[in-house]
């Protein structure tokens, strides 16, 4: 019995000891040594290139579209219409060899060139189309599209017409040109408004010689009975001074002097007269600007033809005529400087007109103009 109790006690002690050991705190573990630094990581190896992707399979070809119907052929363009060319017959009033027609020969070439092919002007000398000095009638009737002449040849139509080319004792060339551009042309067109002629400009030149003669002129008495070719207001004054005045076209003067039909003439300036060879048939050339201090020569157009001309060509003709006027004045100024000594070299006496002749003409002219102005409002 005692043995069983003892065995039970020993079992209880053993179980208690085991429980105590299980419940006692565990000793703290020794600190772990610091870990060694980690070695630097080796560089990562470059990745192997990715294998090239397999080529995509070629797409199946799209079915070809049905061909579009061929377009109808475009109609052939109409042939270009040729630019209109304005053909012009233009006449001067003097012979082909005269300085004025020679000037126009060159001037027409310039106009045709400036027109760029739209102008085709053909020049004619005085008498070739219309009778010489009747160029106005030729333009009025449409025989000529253009013409140039002297207004004094129209005295049979208008008493005031002579005032536009020149007046005895009147304006100098530059003054006459300025007056023509500003007042003269409008007045001239007003005077002839009932006709088929329009003035678009004018050419100006130097003073004329007073007279060329086969006979000496020493006093105003020598004018009386003299057979002289003259035109315009100068002719009227010579008549009032007692001369026997005839009107001849420029191309007939040489022969009339040569044959004795006339004793003297007034044509134009020494440079112009030289081109008509008057040095062969005169003995004296008398100089003075009083009889004709300038010469303004209108440039005329046929109104019906002018109405068909485009504004661009109208402007070209008008503006180039202004330039041509000054060019001709310059040309003839130089020609006079050459001609006067040339006349002397041919044996012609080149002299100033005697003062009493010059004064007599100026006095008669002043009275004449006053008388006509009192009669005719337009003349005034």
What are these regions (language model features)?
Residues 24-26, 46, 79-176, 187-380:
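N-terminal secretory/targeting leader peptides
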Residues 1-87:
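Short, low-complexity disordered leader/linker segments with a strong preference
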